[in-house]
Amino acid sequence: LNAPDRHTLLDYLLSRPLILEHQDALLVHAGIPPQWSISDAVQNAELVHQQLRTNNPEKFLSKMYDNEPSSYSDKLSNEEKCRYTINALMRMRFCKSNGELEFNHKLNIDQTPVGFKAWFFHANRILKDKDIFFGHWSTLKGFNIEHIYPMDHGCVWGEKLSAFRLIDRTLISQESIEGN
């Protein structure tokens, strides 16, 4: 939040949803906790947007980067619910089936921390039949599981920038101009 154009950036981000639903697809930065339905995810994302619109956004955001709470509960304060929601939708890779988040590992999927799984591997995941497009995990390139579309193909690391055209279900990729 120290960028000289932070107010312009914040205004833009305030206008963007944390989760986007289009036809039978969901778009999210990192993932959706396995215990959440679409309405849970949208409702909690809207709570974050309400807080951003009604409070000082810079002050609110300064309280959001923390690893706690690592689990969601209706008993959490609104601030804690917002922090969990931001962490889940924006930072999550590994979690437990109850949605307990793990942030210490940024590893490939075959290096899962003990007791955790990739958020989309949980057998009890509610959104099994919904296409979910997400980024945030460049080591998943080439990964294939039904209804799960990891879209971070490592452009920032000199690899590919990718997009998915929903109308004809086409993946479009462009090599990074930086190269490896």
Where do the PLM segments sit?
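Alpha/beta-hydrolase fold catalytic core
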Residues: 65-141
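Short C-terminal domain-edge/linker segments immediately following a structured domain
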Residues: 55-63, 120-121, 162-167, 179-180
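Active-site neighborhood of divalent metal-dependent phosphoester bond hydrolases
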Residues: 1-78
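Hydrophobic N-terminal alpha-helices or hydrophobic patches in metabolic proteins across all domains
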Residues: 1, 35, 101-103, 140, ...
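Residues that form or immediately flank small-molecule/cofactor binding pockets and catalytic motifs
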Residues: 18, 32, 94, 137, ...
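Conserved hydrophobic/aromatic beta-strand scaffold that supports enzyme active sites
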Residues: 12, 19, 27, 88, ...
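Conserved beta-sheet core of the metallophosphoesterase superfamily
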Residues: 41-49, 113-175
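Flexible, active-site-adjacent loop/turn segments at secondary-structure boundaries
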Residues: 30, 46, 87, 92, ...
